[in-house]
């Protein structure tokens, strides 16, 4: 297996399995973490709470990087009708509010939406997708377009919005309980007490990941925490990791296939939406989540509050 050593993997090691020098760096940066935590806490106060008349559910996490928010949002959309996803649209090359999908019709380009939003747009059970830096405007637009439920991707820190907060608890904990840059936490760890439900893998949901072995495939991925795909590394001839949200270039992928005498790219769906027009033969790594009764019933109870 060949691995491309890059900044993304260095960060993964720094936050979750640091060596001696990375631990030293974390302590050197600790004063910056204290400042970061202070301003992060300050930002959660002094804003009027905004209340909506329909269910708003947030799926988020405290730590840096991916913890499975996208598969969990998809799982909620499979369980409940009329779900619209609202997200910031990280790394998109556009500003403001864009309706990416409405009632199963895709209305904008990948450049305008960003990779995560476009991945949602291809999910049949999701009725609409909206990107907006201002989540309140995004929620308002979703309900205007007929959403029954709005699911916010990565909005735990938006405490000015009254919502049902699901906080994903990762199986792999950050090495230090510090905020950025000394640790992986975006908010101090005690903020988890503000969640309505802390979802733990195995107890509240089950994660499925599947792809067939293919010796003629190169695995290429640009997701956070690529080692989540560890069990699949041996299923391809070679593996390459790129920075989260990386914009693939056709020529570089062609060169990787030629280098290893392969004819197929092994990708997550988030990666696939960025290369689908390149004409490559692709094999998708299926990443799914199934809700367990503990989480499903909590969401049902919350939704029923709006039916009274």
UniProtKB/Swiss-Prot annotation:
GO terms for cellular component: plasma membrane. Its EC number is 2.7.1.130. One of its GO terms (molecular function) is tetraacyldisaccharide 4'-kinase activity. One of its GO terms (biological process) is lipopolysaccharide core region biosynthetic process. Pathway: Glycolipid biosynthesis; lipid IV(A) biosynthesis; lipid IV(A) from (3R)-3-hydroxytetradecanoyl-[acyl-carrier-protein] and UDP-N-acetyl-alpha-D-glucosamine: step 6/6. It catalyses: a lipid A disaccharide + ATP = a lipid IVA + ADP + H(+). ATP binds at residues 63-70. InterPro entries: LpxK. Keywords: ATP-binding, Kinase, Lipid A biosynthesis, Lipid biosynthesis, Lipid metabolism, Nucleotide-binding, Transferase. Transfers the gamma-phosphate of ATP to the 4'-position of a tetraacyldisaccharide 1-phosphate intermediate (termed DS-1-P) to form tetraacyldisaccharide 1,4'-bis-phosphate (lipid IVA). HAMAP family: LpxK. Belongs to the LpxK family. PANTHER family: TETRAACYLDISACCHARIDE 4'-KINASE, TETRAACYLDISACCHARIDE 4'-KINASE, MITOCHONDRIAL-RELATED. This is Tetraacyldisaccharide 4'-kinase. The gene is lpxK.
């Amino acid at each position: 297996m060949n691995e491309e050593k890059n900044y993304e993997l260095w960060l993964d090691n720094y936050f979750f399995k640091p060596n001696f020098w990375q631990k030293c760096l974390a302590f050197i940066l600790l004063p910056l973490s204290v400042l970061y935590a202070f301003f992060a806490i300050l930002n959660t106060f002094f804003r009027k709470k905004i209340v909506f008349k329909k269910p708003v559910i947030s799926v988020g996490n405290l730590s840096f990087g991916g913890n499975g928010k996208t598969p969990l949002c998809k799982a909620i959309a499979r369980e409940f009708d009329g779900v619209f996803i609202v997200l910031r649209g990280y790394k998109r090359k556009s500003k403001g509010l864009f309706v990416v999908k409405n009632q199963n019709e895709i209305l904008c380009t990948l450049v305008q939406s960003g990779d995560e939003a476009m991945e949602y747009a291809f999910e049949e059970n999701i009725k609409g997708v909206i990107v907006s830096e201002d989540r309140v405007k995004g929620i308002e637009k979703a309900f205007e377009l007929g959403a029954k439920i709005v699911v916010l991707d990565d909005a735990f820190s938006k405490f000015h919005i009254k919502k049902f907060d699901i906080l994903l608890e990762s199986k792999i904990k950050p090495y230090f309980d510090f905020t950025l840059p000394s640790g992986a936490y975006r908010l101090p760890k005690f903020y988890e007490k503000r969640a309505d439900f802390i979802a733990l893998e195995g107890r509240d949901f089950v994660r499925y990941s599947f792809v067939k072995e293919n010796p003629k495939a190169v695995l290429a991925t640009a997701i956070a925490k690529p080692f989540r795909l560890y069990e699949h590394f041996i299923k391809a001839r070679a593996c390459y990791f790129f920075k989260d949200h990386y914009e693939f270039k056709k020529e570089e992928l062609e060169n990787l296939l030629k280098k290893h005498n392969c004819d197929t790219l092994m990708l997550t769906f988030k990666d696939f939406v960025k290369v689908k027009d390149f004409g490559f033969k692709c094999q998708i790594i299926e990443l799914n989540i199934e809700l367990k009764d503990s989480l499903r019933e909590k969401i049902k109870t919350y939704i029923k509050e709006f039916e009274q």
